[in-house]
């Protein structure tokens, strides 16, 4: 086991504080509408330019191991806030730095770190309660656009795009962000259910120009297993031919005689038919087939349910107004499923999302939910260069996360005003234990940190801004750093999601109070370099080899 280096009390805290400051100072320059960019070297390709706090935090690695530990703890704040709220990482970092700095001073002055921690927790609980009380529900599409715009650093088109996407796919819908090949940033909305399986044979194509299969008012046969023999399919095929409607077959696979017969029927014009493989794998495939069955008002043909293909009638088939299939995707639009059944399925999937502990499973369940409940929107981010596209994509993702958070818990005045106004709630708390009271006062002072930083990044003195806002008794009065004016933040549309503000403070105080109570730090001693190999002597006597 390698030897360790151990630092204690003041020495440990000083080193840790230096690390916290390096990381926080690199991150906090990005805060607010006039925040600057950070340029990050990449071992491959062009450097990356970003205004995203968590992206900067993840890149900071310090040489001194003790300083690095402090930096890593604050990086944890940014990552946790990003995971929970998806935005507010820079605010969380600024708050953590402020709490650690003040806490370290208090410990150096001889106060009890555990009492300080208790004071910090009491104050944070009061602030969270205050923020939740002030939060105003998001009602209109315009308010969603405002949240998106603020989070995308004042980029109004991005805010509008997110509002448009959320309006179309609903709050349950899935919105993904991708890079676009062109200069434009655009929204692509897929209505209905889309899954990533294309036609099994190009002979099914009905639109030769677009190479797609288009079926109007189609029947849909959903089968859990492979279809290879023809005999069992004949009764249902004959019934569909008599109805004169097209047919889509979704099964684990369609092969051999079954596929050949379908192709021949299609070419002869007897039956307008197409076949695709079922989406997903294993248990997930079965669940997705059941989703499609509910959406289209059909039944999944499964031997578990005792239904055989030979006994299938038209009533068991799903129906859809339109089905479009290309080489890679199938889209089912306007399925004939009953609304109460779809809603019951949606509730069931929501319950599974609550229960699952796996991020991957949660993501897949969320996708299934979106396909049933709303739809899928893709925001394609464009730009002149790869560096610009990546920077813009960071901002779009932040804005998207912020709008989702706003829909969940409502909005509060932005620009650090909500935290500053919460000072009143903390000011009412008093504690007989002077060290606990000192912990409460640490949070009281830290609540000013975000608004001071926003002002300083805009080139304005932070103390003056804080003083002016606190003088004014209007709760929503604040400082617009973009125009450098004092305005009503809600009226001007400068808002933050309550969830983002709350999460930023809770995560910052949680990690910062742990750092304040640190009394010793242990790190591995750097290994001494191994001595170099001696020069290759002793190879004499080779002179006669004629070289």
UniProtKB/Swiss-Prot annotation:
One GO term of the biological process aspect: protein refolding
Keywords recorded for this protein, A-Z: ATP-binding, Chaperone, Cytoplasm, Isomerase, Nucleotide-binding
Enzyme class: isomerase
PROSITE patterns assigned to the protein according to its UniProt record, in alphabetical order: CHAPERONINS_CPN60
Keyword Cytoplasm found: yes
Binding site for ATP: 30-33, 51, 87-91, 415, 496
Keyword presence, Nucleotide-binding: yes
CDD domains in UniProt: GroEL
Catalyses which reaction(s): ATP + H2O + a folded polypeptide = ADP + phosphate + an unfolded polypeptide
EC number in record: 5.6.1.7
Record's subcellular location: Cytoplasm
Family matches, as InterPro entries: Chaperonin_Cpn60_CS, Cpn60/GroEL, Cpn60/GroEL/TCP-1, GroEL-like_apical_dom_sf, GROEL-like_equatorial_sf, TCP-1-like_intermed_sf
Chief location of this protein within or outside the cell: cytoplasm
GO MF terms held by the record: ATP binding; ATP-dependent protein folding chaperone; isomerase activity; unfolded protein binding
One GO CC annotation: cytoplasm
Stored HAMAP family: CH60
Function field: Together with its co-chaperonin GroES, plays an essential role in assisting protein folding. The GroEL-GroES system forms a nano-cage that allows encapsulation of the non-native substrate proteins and provides a physical environment optimized to promote and accelerate protein folding.
Family: Belongs to the chaperonin (HSP60) family.
Quaternary structure (record): Forms a cylinder of 14 subunits composed of two heptameric rings stacked back-to-back. Interacts with the co-chaperonin GroES.
Protein name: Chaperonin GroEL 1
Lineage: Bacteria, Pseudomonadati, Pseudomonadota, Alphaproteobacteria, Hyphomicrobiales
Gene: groEL1
